[in-house]
Amino acid sequence: MAKLLSFSDESRSALERGVDALADAVRVTIGPRGRNVVLEKKFGAPDIVNDGDSIAREIELDDPFENLGAKLMQQVASKTKDKAGDGTTTATVLAQAMVREGLRNTAAGASPVELRRGMEKAAAHIVAGLSERSQAIAGDAIRQVATVSSGGDEEVGRMIAEAMDKVSTDGVITVEESKSLATELEITEGMAFDRGYSSPYFVTDADRQVCEFDNPLILLTDRKISTITDLVPVLETVQKSGSPLLILSEEVEGEALATLVMNKSRGVLQVAAVRAPSFGERRKAALADIAILTGGTLISEDKAMTLDKVTLEDLGKARRVTISKENTTIVANDDHRQAVSERVSAIRRELEATESDYDREKLQERIAKLAGGVAVIKVGAPTETELKNRKLRIEDALNATRAAVEEGIVAGGGSTLLQLADSLDALASSLNGDQRTGVEIVQRALTAPIHQIATNAGQNGDVVIAGMRSSGQGFNALSGVYEDLMAAGIVDAAKVVRLAVQDSISIASLLITTEVVIADKPEPPAPAPAGDGDPMGGMGGMGGMGMPGMGGMGMPGMM
């Protein structure tokens, strides 16, 4: 494909226009009085969202060079989302401010490389400052973090705090759509483990990059599955039942994996494969635990059991399964509560008998996974659009709360960023030339989030920042008063703030050192069909579906 090239100031200006286009769409959502953004969908009703990452992913610009700038900003949002689960809008606002200041100084003759070094030194100083300011989360702080991260929704804050209290801060908490209008919390049997899908082609929700099944059947085996032949009988049986299928095994690879992916892509069968957790004998024990939880049978080599003899009765059942790139959560039915209780008792007896510290630790982990249960927040709303928006807010709040448990909390509302900006004075004074300018770029950018929070609340950002500095307190954008935000319960997760700063500095410092931009040359539009006839040419018939059962591919019963 032919390429387009852009050089020097022209290339950087195009990138900046792309950065601004995306950031201006995202920045309106920041703060408790942030606005919503409407996203058109190819099918169905438009989405109304308040989530920076969701907005950023939707943006694609006509100009190829500007689009590259937008794509770089999407990286800021997605990286922060992946690592912290929240803070995407803050990271985007910070990056935009740094890019603008950095390119202005570059155009004035500053060395981009020295600017970058100064910005990186500022980043290290900020990380250290955050660590000093963070406080361990305790008591009511969990509810406060969740409330702030959900846009001030007290009900969500209370519900997340209650969920963490019941299943512990390390427990499994999932968010799903409710069939009623109310948002409810339910504690049920379930388990989570750190294994994700074997192929990204199993994803059912492209926006969130997860695979979700309701009422799936679960095939459990300690075998490695390489060929599809052994699986054909059970796949045909599951297809007739109309249920999704999760395969938990030592590994699914080669021909078997390729065939499953193809059948999933063609809509023949809703299926996903996940490697079983742990290793060796511990893997078999983990699979046996899941079998008890789901009422299934472990198809084990030790018992000379084979996959081609599996029946529907051998498969486990769950209420819901959620699979991400790295984790799998099984929300079980309550049908097997007694069996789970007996299994936990048996593991406790093993725990009492063992003298190995390592074995003791692993047995305790198994007990925690089986007995801890799963907290399910069932989100309800009057309309589908509001339901999606509310679900996104709750997921963000849950992620931010987990981040707060990891690294503690700091004062929210942009006040900690303003304090960190003022603390950079000493670092800037110790440097000379363009490195000092690089620190000052970060220093000015750190005020951008509070400036935008104030603007979204109908206040003058410059006046609010001056008021915060003179009073030594934060600005509560909801009430419009200056107060101690930590005492008022307006707090942020330190991890979210740290990653927002680090990711924004990383992308901005790379962008201002850009000298050449290379983009794909847009292809000319396809010519319109000749004549006034049917542009589809009558479809020419479908020629049959070629899908008797799951036939095709030269294998009995498989596509």
Curated annotation (Swiss-Prot):
The keyword Transmembrane helix does not apply. It comes from Synechococcus sp. (strain CC9605). The gene is groEL1. Together with its co-chaperonin GroES, plays an essential role in assisting protein folding. The GroEL-GroES system forms a nano-cage that allows encapsulation of the non-native substrate proteins and provides a physical environment optimized to promote and accelerate protein folding. One of its GO terms (biological process) is protein refolding. GO terms for cellular component: cytoplasm. Its main location: cytoplasm. GO terms for molecular function: ATP binding; ATP-dependent protein folding chaperone; isomerase activity; unfolded protein binding. InterPro entries: Chaperonin_Cpn60_CS (IPR018370), Cpn60/GroEL (IPR001844), Cpn60/GroEL/TCP-1 (IPR002423), GroEL-like_apical_dom_sf (IPR027409), GROEL-like_equatorial_sf (IPR027413), TCP-1-like_intermed_sf (IPR027410). Keywords: ATP-binding, Chaperone, Cytoplasm, Isomerase, Nucleotide-binding. Belongs to the chaperonin (HSP60) family. ATP binds at T29, I30, G31, P32, D86, G87, T88, T89, T90, G413, N476, A477, L478, D492. It catalyses: ATP + H2O + a folded polypeptide = ADP + phosphate + an unfolded polypeptide. This is Chaperonin GroEL 1. Forms a cylinder of 14 subunits composed of two heptameric rings stacked back-to-back. Interacts with the co-chaperonin GroES. Its EC number is 5.6.1.7. PROSITE patterns: CHAPERONINS_CPN60. Residues 521-541 are annotated as: Disordered. HAMAP family: CH60. It is found in: Cytoplasm. Transmembrane segments: none annotated.
